[in-house]
């Protein structure tokens, strides 16, 4: 495929911003350290300004404040250089559209609805009574079981699985190995063994949701597990049954959300976070990587961190200073206690 080429003026005409210097052509986005004359790079953090001076990039995306330090360079000045970089990267890597057609080895049940605009890959399976929207891409070995409903332009990458009865909104993307709608972990103890509770709910994903590789979102026990519009979930995340996750929340890899947790909108949850079940996390909460969330967070906008116990980020950072000194402090405390005890004995 011939690489796309854009001049700086063409980029700003599409995305806004202001170009300065020569109206050069660029063919790709690269990091400052690797960029060459045909590439465009970006400066998101001012502390890396020195890298701009050392870079061979043909052009650099910068903020208006930073631009004054780079006279003579080809620039695009943007309010948010990092977001602008993401949009430029999308220009060079456009969303792949479905090539209509069903591979001869795919299996589509007769009662399924598959528009001609959909692309069904090799060995893929579409179950009975499932309805696909326009322009879906169900790639090799992906499975959509019976009675599902997929919106327009949904993408299932190879070996992704959507269990029966689930609903996916428009432009949902499910990466390889992810499983949507497997049974939740619901068991009742029967005295000498565990009795499995039928999981009769399903999973509902809103528009523009993205689910990473090998992530599992379990179906609800009686009502649906839900994920709101625009939420992005990384690889190897476990979402337990009955969870309700709001819109535009992001969850990083290796996080485990126990059953019946409600998470608000615009939350940021770092990698390796674990939660107990049946709690609520307010809108716009930020949870640092590795945090154990043991109780509800009711105040919106909190920034929490700490392996254990959970606390505000400010409290955790202040207390973390002392962790490596605990042994020394314990020795000093014992010495002081002994001195006080000796002083008490001497006064008798």
Curated annotation (Swiss-Prot):
GO terms for molecular function: N-acyltransferase activity. Gene3D superfamilies: 1.20.5.170, Hexapeptide repeat proteins (2.160.10.10), MurE/MurF, N-terminal domain (3.40.1390.10). Keywords: Acyltransferase, Lipid A biosynthesis, Lipid biosynthesis, Lipid metabolism, Repeat, Transferase. It catalyses: a UDP-3-O-[(3R)-3-hydroxyacyl]-alpha-D-glucosamine + a (3R)-hydroxyacyl-[ACP] = a UDP-2-N,3-O-bis[(3R)-3-hydroxyacyl]-alpha-D-glucosamine + holo-[ACP] + H(+). The active site is at residue 241. Pathway: Bacterial outer membrane biogenesis; LPS lipid A biosynthesis. One of its GO terms (cellular component) is membrane. Transmembrane segments: none annotated. It comes from the Bacteria. Its EC number is 2.3.1.191. InterPro entries: Hexapep, Hexapep_transf_CS, LpxD, Trimer_LpxA-like_sf, UDP_GlcNAc_AcTrfase_non-rep. It is an enzyme of class 2 (transferase). HAMAP family: LpxD. PANTHER family: UDP-3-O-ACYLGLUCOSAMINE N-ACYLTRANSFERASE, UDP-3-O-ACYLGLUCOSAMINE N-ACYLTRANSFERASE 1, MITOCHONDRIAL-RELATED. Belongs to the transferase hexapeptide repeat family. LpxD subfamily. Homotrimer. Catalyzes the N-acylation of UDP-3-O-acylglucosamine using 3-hydroxyacyl-ACP as the acyl donor. Is involved in the biosynthesis of lipid A, a phosphorylated glycolipid that anchors the lipopolysaccharide to the outer membrane of the cell. This is UDP-3-O-acylglucosamine N-acyltransferase. It comes from Neisseria meningitidis serogroup C / serotype 2a (strain ATCC 700532 / DSM 15464 / FAM18).
